[in-house]
Amino acid sequence: MEALLQLKGIDKAFPGVKALSGAALNVYPGRVIALVGENGAGKSTMMKVLTGIYTRDAGTLLWLGKETTFTGPKSSQEAGIGIIHQELNLIPQLTIAENIFLGREFVNRFGKIDWKTMYAEADKLLAKLNLCFKSDKLVGDLSIGDQQMVEIAKVLSFESKVIIMDEPTDALTDTETESLFRVIRELKSQGRGIVYISHRMKEIFEICDDVTVFRDGQFIAEREVASLTEDSLIEMMVGRKLEDQYPHLDKAPGDIRLKVDNLCGPGVNDVSFTLRKGEILGVSGLMGAGRTELMKVLYGAQPRTSGYVTLDGHEVVTRSPQDGLANGIVYISEDRKRDGLVLGMSVKENMSLTALRYFSRAGGSLKHADEQQAVSDFIRLFNVKTPSMEQAIGLLSGGNQQKVAIARGLMTRPKVLILDEPTRGVDVGAKKEIYQLINQFKADGLSIILVSSEMPEVLGMSDRIIVMHEGHLSGEFTREQATQEVLMAAAVGKLNRVNQE
């Protein structure tokens, strides 16, 4: 079968960093190829070389059998290569049709927009994807899943033969993911080639035909998915065996550090639990169960309407995140790009931002040498891959950004560390490193609350697990009692709480 798109021997270097070295990718008609690798493996750089955002230093790009160089996203798009980014590029205040044909609206012979034709053409594109809504609907009124379908329709409007999807299910529900997979199968049947970039093993084995593996900017292998197992694919990605994905530290917790009694707030109803020194408390539940809301009430980011919180035997009241920090409670947000990091600032500035009081003199000036030493120590401890501490954090991979976010929390010397989805969007290798860090914090006596939608992660890392359902606590289990079936039953409200006090 002749490839629609071939990239061979691609090199790309930046000052101090060799991003790609001999990288390769083949995309075939009617097949879905997964592009996988750890964060920083070169996947994003390869896509930018492909679409003309970056100029390759060496190598060839063959499009429909002819050697080609694209001068930018517009030229690759017009040639028939569409890309759907992780962050959707839509304008909520415009209709679906206006978004699809933005900048290339249909006009009549008088130079005015031909709305009737534009909406009719947009409706045809939606019908191709078997979507039930019309193109006169505002994009802002759609769910994230439906907005993604609009992005696909927009790509199809360019008659795209190859469609690149970057982490397409990151913000989707299970139902929306299944809808997306139906559309991908339809696109396959039309003879289009799909590049599917994802960290989610389950999805790769469900929807992809082939897989290309990158590691450290190099092409490692191209295989048929059917010939692989999850373990063999992960080994190719990280270059080593992952014998123990969840390295649990078997150390008995100490005395009670945090006690929460009858806590209420937005989306949180009458929740009580305890947390011990040197303990990892897992928090499980379905999307919308109130897990993040509970953590924000505890930390002070959302108002507490009633209930009590005691820390080391003393009552604490957190009316703001500053109160949480002052009392030794640190919250690492699930949305690091919106709540956790300032992407335009450097690694150093992000890491020390909430701990500047430790580096300040009486007059308010900073002890820069102390700040730099602390940041340097954390970069080394956390194995943060960055050219320097002055690098803009937005240029780091997701796993390294997450390490910086956690390091920033630890710089404030907390007693309680709340990690909300700490490995979301992080590759398997970086996940293992984060788990090892969490165990290190536990060994040092830090009390950790681990909120996660990944059940194996909660089961593998936690000493004890509580489950949320519709704002209430629906279950509490020891490590020995907890199974995926038990947690799921509690998550859907089918189990009464098991008190382990």
Swiss-Prot record:
Gene Ontology CC terms, in alphabetical order: plasma membrane
Gene3D superfamilies per record? P-loop containing nucleotide triphosphate hydrolases
Q: By its UniProt entry, which SUPFAM superfamilies does this protein fall under?
A: P-loop containing nucleoside triphosphate hydrolases (SSF52540)
Under CDD domains, the record lists: ABC_Carb_Monos_I, ABC_Carb_Monos_II
* Residues at which ATP binds: G37, E38, N39, G40, A41, G42, K43, S44
Q: Does the keyword Transport apply?
A: yes
According to the entry, every stretch annotated as the ABC transporter domain falls at 5-241, 252-495
* Keywords for the protein's UniProt record, in alphabetical order: ATP-binding, Cell inner membrane, Cell membrane, Membrane, Nucleotide-binding, Repeat, Sugar transport, Translocase, Transport
Matching entries from Pfam families are given as: ABC_tran
What membrane topology does the UniProt entry give?
Answer: Peripheral membrane protein
Question: Does the entry feature the keyword Phosphoprotein, yes or no?
Answer: no
Q: Which family does it belong to?
A: Belongs to the ABC transporter superfamily. Ribose importer (TC 3.A.1.2.1) family.
Quaternary organization: The complex is composed of an ATP-binding protein (RbsA), two transmembrane proteins (RbsC) and a solute-binding protein (RbsB).
What is the name attached to this protein's record?
Answer: Ribose import ATP-binding protein RbsA
Which species does this protein come from? Shigella sonnei (strain Ss046)
